[in-house]
Amino acid sequence: MNPIRPVALLVTHGVLGEELVRTVAAILGPQPDVATVSNSGFSADGLTNAIEQRVREFPADAPVVLFTDLAAGSCGIASRRLGVEGRIVRKITGVNLPMLLEFFHYRDTLSLDELLPRMEAKGKAGIVIL
């Protein structure tokens, strides 16, 4: 069991992050310790500042898993510029529903080092050509 539950921050274009959180809640029930930041209306520096502010709103000892939609988009770039001293912030791009379900289902029982590769694998496995 994880001694300190990791928290989730989704940084996405438009309302994608909010809709993903709503969809997770419809499947697993409401999830605590999750927030979103949209890039809408922000400059590059403004988006980075908004992300930093959100990270600081979480408990100081909680590891933050920062999900972005596109690695090369404004959200991915801003997350790479993030500098929050004294915080554990792990970043993963290409957020999708299978990845988030894996995170919320296992964040209380697996360490971050176990959980992150599992989330990546589940996210990739969720992409199937039929």
Where are the regions that the model predicts?
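N-terminal loops that bind phosphate or other acidic moieties
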Residues: 1-130
